[in-house]
Regions:
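Rossmann-fold cofactor-recognition segment
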Residues: 46-61
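Residue(s) in the substrate-gating loop at a strand-loop-helix junction
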Residues: 136
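Substrate-binding pocket helix/loop in short-chain dehydrogenase/reductase
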Residues: 93-106
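Conserved NAD(P)H cofactor-binding loop of Rossmann-fold oxidoreductase domains
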Residues: 85-91
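C-terminal helical subdomain
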Residues: 174-175, 190-232
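Conserved glycine-rich cofactor-binding loop
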Residues: 14-15
């Protein structure tokens, strides 16, 4: 018997880990991607059949409203998975980000996640669904990205709080990917140099992320060790 198609929202699904996750899921599930790109830029990179809503998380309230409206337009009355993957950051040497950079980082990485979790909880509860917060190993502290690290630490705390608050109604997990071969560092203004060669490829990180989501465990760190050795590589599928 074929598994039922799940209804899944993915933020930050037009590049990097998010896009690779969407590509893995699109043929088996109904996907709504939310992102900052215009429709004309986003739709060509997404698999056929994936819905898209232009919802830049730099304005968390407007983005939350746009995503909820897109779900209603699609006729969704419940939500199986909410994957809050979108993230941004700025690299600085010997200091801390500017006020504008701090506001943008916290808006995209933390405030939007809080608002989306609150707004979409009723959809998740109807499905007995899962909220997945995509953090980072940087949540333990990252010198070049202090506000980014703080925002990911905030997500870790949010996951713990919601996991207790929503117990028995909605599963909540935090997943912390390790260094991944995406455009993130370049966009942040940081060149990792030759270290980039040992970063985990985005498609392999997405495979581990899918497995972690399917397992519903929390917290989960998707590390070099798991990738290179294959140990507990989170190879399950949604």
């Amino acid at each position: 018997m074929a598994e039922a198609r799940r209804r899944i929202v993915v933020t930050g699904g037009t590049s990097g880990i998010g896009l690779e996750l969407v590509r893995r899921l699109a043929d088996r599930h109904d996907i709504l991607v939310a992102g900052r790109r215009a429709d004309t830029d986003a739709l060509p990179v997404l698999p056929e059949g994936v819905r898209y809503v232009h919802a830049p998380l730099t304005d968390p309230e407007a983005a939350t409203q746009a995503i909820a409206e897109a779900m209603l337009k699609a006729g969704w009355v419940k939500l199986d998975n909410l994957v809050l993957n979108a993230g941004t950051g700025f690299a600085v040497e010997g200091g801390i980000e500017s006020a504008a950079q701090i506001r943008e980082t916290l808006a995209v990485n933390l405030t939007a996640s809080v608002l989306l979790a609150r707004a979409l909880f009723p959809w998740l509860e109807k499905a007995g669904g899962t909220l997945t917060l995509v953090g980072s190993v940087a949540h333990t502290g990252q010198g070049l990205f202090p506000a980014y690290a703080a925002s990911k630490a905030g997500l870790h705390g949010l996951a713990r709080a919601l996991r207790a608050e929503w117990s028995g109604r909605v599963a909540v997990q935090i997943v912390h990917p390790g260094p991944t071969r995406t455009e993130m560092h370049a966009k942040a203004g940081h060149d990792p140099g030759r270290l980039r060669d040992i970063f985990i490829p985005a498609d392999r990180m997405a495979a581990m992320l899918e497995g972690a989501i399917a397992a519903r465990r929390s917290p989960v760190t998707l590390s070099f060790g798991r990738y290179w050795t294959g140990r507990a590589a989170w190879s399950g599928k949604l």
